[in-house]
C-alpha cells in the first residue's frame, strides 16, 4: 500500500504518517515475529509514555516560532510483488532513494502530488541498471487508493484507542487524507 518513498506536504502530514506507521514485529517487541502491527515513528517499544502525547510533542515542535523544520519522508523498502517477493533490491540501492530525498531537500528534482504526499517522477529517481520492469516500477510508485480507503477505518479505530490524547491536528490530517482519497476515487470512476 505504501509506495517506495513519499514526501510529506507539511509538518503535520509527516507527523500523521509517522503516527500510523506499521511494521513487522521484531525481537524488540512482544508478539509473533513478522506479524504486522502499528509502530508509530518506529518508537513503540522504546516510548515510556502515551504515544499520542508523544505525537503532540512533534505537532508542537512544528508550532515553535522561527522553527526551521526539515522535510519529512516516508519509505517502504519492503513492498512485495504478487509472488510475495520484494520488488525493491534494497541494500546499497537504497542510496538511490536517499539521493532523491537529498535532491528534493535542495529543490533539484520535481515531485508528483498525490493524496498521500509527493512522489518521485519517473525521471527523478535513478533506476538505471536495476533491471526493474515497467510494471515493477509502477508498483513501487503506485498509490493504492483503494487500499488506503480500506485502511481509514483501521486508523480511526487505532486513534480511538488513545482516547482524547490524539492531537486535533492529526485528526484533521486523517480527514484531509480521506477527502483526498475520495476525490481520486471519484475522478477514476
State where each predicted segment sits:
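Conserved NTP phosphate-binding and transfer environment spanning the P-loop NTPase/kinase superfamily
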Residues: 1-188
Amino acid at each position: 500500500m505504501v509506495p517506495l518513498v513519499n514526501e510529506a506536504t507539511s509538518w503535520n502530514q509527516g507527523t500523521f504518517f509517522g503516527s500510523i506507521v506499521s511494521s513487522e514485529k521484531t525481537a524488540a517487541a512482544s508478539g509473533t515475529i513478522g506479524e504486522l502491527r502499528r509502530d508509530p515513528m518506529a518508537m513503540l517499544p522504546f516510548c515510556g509514555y502515551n504515544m499520542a502525547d508523544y505525537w503532540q510533542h512533534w505537532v508542537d515542535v512544528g508550532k515553535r516560532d522561527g522553527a526551521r523544520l526539515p522535510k519529512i519522508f516516508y519509505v517502504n523498502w519492503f513492498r512485495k510483488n504478487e509472488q510475495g517477493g520484494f520488488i525493491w533490491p534494497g541494500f546499497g540501492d537504497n542510496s538511490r532513494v536517499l539521493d532523491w530525498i537529498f535532491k528534493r531537500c535542495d529543490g533539484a528534482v520535481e515531485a508528483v502530488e498525490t493524496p498521500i504526499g509527493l512522489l518521485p517522477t519517473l525521471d527523478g529517481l535513478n533506476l538505471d541498471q536495476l533491471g526493474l520492469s515497467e510494471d515493477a516500477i509502477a508498483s513501487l510508485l503506485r498509490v493504492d487508493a483503494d487500499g488506503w480507503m480500506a485502511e481509514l477505518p483501521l486508523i480511526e479505530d487505532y486513534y480511538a484507542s488513545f482516547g482524547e490524547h490524539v492531537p486535533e491536528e492529526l485528526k484533521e490530517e486523517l480527514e484531509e487524507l480521506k477527502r483526498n482519497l475520495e476525490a481520486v476515487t471519484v475522478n477514476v470512476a
